[in-house]
Every structure is written in structure tokens, then in C-alpha cells.
Amino acid sequence: MIVKTRAVVLRDIKYRDQSKICLLLTREYGQVSVILKGGRSAKSKTGMLFSPGNLIDAVLYKKGNRDLQLASDASLVKSPLSETPDLERFSVLYRVLDLVRYASGPEEKNVPLFTLVAATIERLCDTERDFQPILAGFLLRLVSVLGFTPALKRCVFSNYDLLGSIEEMQLDELLFVHDPGGFALPGSAVPMGATIQRVPVSHYLFIRALAATGSQAACPEASPEEVSAVTALLQEYCACHLGRMPHRKHLDIVSRLISA
């Protein structure tokens, strides 16, 4: 059947002479692998629309028993690639796309995830500088969408209020705990095998401010060094939990098609 769906292009790969295979994150169907016949031809009107990072309305010939669907048409909604070239924008964009590839699976509808990715791409399109806070916000919301929201209000071990304890004990450091995710007070009884990091209280306050900020609102202010450190922390936390997700069979399918 012919279906129309909004989609984010996660990846494109050359296929044979003039075609290409694309991995899409769609609103209605989750990840879908599609082939765009003649998509690399100079005469193709839609080939360039199926470029990584583009937000598009795609028309597909979809069959339920087929691993590779046929893309027939598309219209552009937003494209970070059409903005003024900026290496930092592209770096953030491709980190987002790479994470989403592993955070979602074929035919697994996840509207909150799609909404987050689409909103992040729109933010990248509408922002002229300071792209790292957008990445930090994306990482924090991604782990929440996937069900790994870190505890930000209370110590994950003692259940004491974190803000109150910081003020009362005049703390300048907290413990970041990867599993269970969240923050803990120094001196807490840490279970054997728990992965923890000592982090400045300023990291905690910035992450808490990010969590309270809507996806379309301006990111809280912080120094570039603070943003970079928090982004690295959240990326490590995200990778820790994504590494436990099941292997996605569509990646094998695409690899076999490329090598055919």
C-alpha cells in the first residue's frame, strides 16, 4: 500500500549504479529501510531530499513482509544542510543521528522519540551558534524517552533531597551513578559494582536546569567548558544504557545488500 509519513533521514548508502538505500526514522512506523531507485541520478528530483539530517514527508510503497521498502516521493520540511555551513552544527547533527540509529528499531513506533529528534533538528536549523547545549538537552531527553531517566531530586541511595543537602552540607561535589541512573550524596553507602563519578555540583545544577527546560525553549546558560563536560557525562551515560539494547536486525540486512 502507498503510505505518507513524516521522517528523519538517518543514513544513506550508495547502492549499485544510481540508486541508494536510506534508513529513516518515521513517525508512524519507527525505523524503516527504503530503496530510492535512481536516487543518485542527476535527473532525480527527490534524491537530494533523502540526505542524512533532513526532515521530510516521504511517500512509500510499503509491504508488511518486506525488509526493504520502496520510496517514491518526498517533500522537504526542514534541512540543517541548507543552513550556513557550520562544522559544529554538522558535528552535533551526526552525533544525534548516530545515537538515534541505535536507540530505535525496525517497525518500532515511538512517537516521543520521533518528536524529540524532529524538534532537535528544527533547533539546529534555527540556531546560528552554541550548538553543544542543544546536544546536551537532546541526550538528557533521549535517555528519558528510553526509560532511563536519571534521578535528579533525591539521592539514589539515601533518598535525601539533593538541593537541600547541597545547601545544608555546603557541598561542591556529588556522585553521578550510571546504574541506577542519577546523583548521590558523598558518603552514601555505594553497592558493590556500581559505576560512579565525582562531579562538580555545577554539573548537577546545569543538568537539572536542562531537565526543566522545554524542548523548544532556550537552553540554560553555562560556560562552554561546563556544557562540554556535561555533554560528555550524558553521552557516557547514554552509551552505557544503549549498549544493553538488543541488536537491530535491519543493520545486518543493509550490510548484506551493500556487499551483494
UniProtKB/Swiss-Prot annotation:
Pfam families, A to Z: RecO_C, RecO_N
Cysteine disulfide partners in this protein: none
Annotated keywords: DNA damage, DNA recombination, DNA repair
GO CC terms = bacterial nucleoid
- Where, if anywhere, are coiled coils annotated? none
GO terms for biological process, alphabetical: DNA recombination; double-strand break repair
Superkingdom of this entry's organism?
Bacteria
What the protein does? Involved in DNA repair and RecF pathway recombination.
Family statement drawn from the similarity comment of this UniProt entry: Belongs to the RecO family.
* Stored NCBIfam families: reco
HAMAP family attached to this UniProt entry: RecO
Q: What is this protein called?
A: DNA repair protein RecO
Q: Which species?
A: Chlorobaculum parvum (strain DSM 263 / NCIMB 8327) (Chlorobium vibrioforme subsp. thiosulfatophilum)
